[in-house]
Amino acid sequence: MADEIADDEPKPLGRCSVFTYGVGHMLNDITSACWYTYLLLYLTDIGLSPSNAATVTLTGQFADALTTIIAGELIDRFGHFKIWHGMGCLLVALSFTSLFGGCLPCKILGSDSPAVKTVGYCISAVIFCSGWSCTQISHMSMVNGVTLNPTSRVACVSCRNAFTMIASLILYAVAFFVFNKKTSSSQVDIKNQYQMMAYISIFIGAVFVIIFQLGTKEPSLKQESDGKRATATWTYWFKKVLYYQVLSIYVLTRVATNVSQTFLAVYVINDLRMSPSSKALIPATIYLSSFIASVLLQELKWSGERLKAFFSAGGLLWLFCGAAVIFLPINMNAFMYVLSVLIGIANALMMVTAIGMESELVDKHLDGSAFVYGSLGFLDKVLCGVFLYFLESYESADPVACDPAYPCFSVTRFSLGFVPGISALIGVVIAFFIKFHTSHPKPLTEPLLA
């Protein structure tokens, strides 16, 4: 009898299947790391005011959010995850060089006025973020169709998160090489640096897109007798308390990671007065520690209770790091490397478990998976966009005068320390009250990134 029950349980995935799925978000990840880490610096370096730079970011975030909902609904109705994924990757690749390589409308109109620049970069941001969301939603919502085994689903998410870290490390290695080349501080040279970084990033990401497209099978989802796709209604999810709990945790996790990533480079340069290379080394340290944590996480046996426990550990660790960021003085800036390791671990714990909770929410309801991922992504992007707009609008493009022995309470410190820390704390409180259906961890048959 025990053998019959075991045979009925979904079989875990093998190493190759997890790998080919996990690399499918690499192009999104490497370009996203550049967007959140360097866009604010880049736009202000080429002459845009902080408020105009914030407008570009907000425009992209809202385009991302809107496309997330539309793509999620269409994927649920018609399927074809891999087609949506490929289409999104194409838009990302085409728009990324324009975003970080110069203002195309400025060249067409022959004008470098702030208004034309802002509109030009907003157009590139809209195309980039729309393509990015198509890739993201199609890739995330595939995981429940790729496997129904709860532990394998978390392993896929953990593998994806590990390659997110690899993508970011690659970007920061490229950035370290680009930013350490001796060039003048003219806008032309600055644009050339970022354009070189954009071309290299797109090439590397495209290689992994090909691996994903060739190695991952299109999930076969159920259909009605008339051949149409069966989809769960929106009201089905809106009636579930678990939906709102998971939504809150996922959105708060994204706020913590995205806001902190956006202000990190400005913080180490303007607030801690560290060397220019630190804007690549500090983020690289964060992603390296996050990568190691993600690899270790995928070897664990997972259940709903463990998802809650590990998320809470990550949230409390972020709370400690946020407090340290706020009170760190200039003469102790070397301690930022220690904080970077802790932030990376906290990010991995929160992100892997938050997405794992999404999979637990969807469970076997594959017919509505894209809506769940899309709706959560929509709120995440709207909220992050609003946060970033207001925070960046009050950001100073120049370092403020500060006593090296005492912390300067700037907008950057508030954005990097307080906002992620409080978001993580609220997420921990919500996680305490969540109840999942799965209570017993199901083991894997083999290690997945050994």
Predicted regions and their residues:
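Membrane-embedded alpha-helical bundles of multi-pass transporters/translocases
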Residues: 2-450
